Amino acid sequence: MLLKSTTRHVHIYAGHVVDGEVHPDTETLTLNVDPDNELEWNEAALAKVEAKFRELVANAAGEDLTEYNLRRIGSDLEHFIRSLLMQGEIGYNLNSRVRNYSLGIPRVNHS
């Protein structure tokens, strides 16, 4: 059985991807960030999300691998991504097929 956690911008699978298919593997966690491309990313922001993911996984070491624990990691990552958006490190992709501003209404800076 494939264990997974999916939020709007974070998909975590207990498995590895081969030719676009996820194969269950309880020794490997695979992270897919923003699969709908709702946000505009830069390398620095993605690196921060990946580092936060590694930190959360390390903090959960020793706990059972359950969907609940994966959901907790996914939820924490979703909040972290929202903080990056609120700090202006990432932004909404206005050309995305999905535009529901799920992390909050965009802010416009007036000069």
Swiss-Prot record:
The keyword Thylakoid applies. It is a peripheral membrane protein. GO terms for cellular component: plasma membrane-derived thylakoid membrane. Signal peptide: none annotated. PANTHER family: NAD(P)H-QUINONE OXIDOREDUCTASE SUBUNIT M, CHLOROPLASTIC. Belongs to the complex I NdhM subunit family. This is NAD(P)H-quinone oxidoreductase subunit M. The lineage of its organism: Bacteria, Bacillati, Cyanobacteriota, Cyanophyceae, Acaryochloridales. The gene is ndhM.
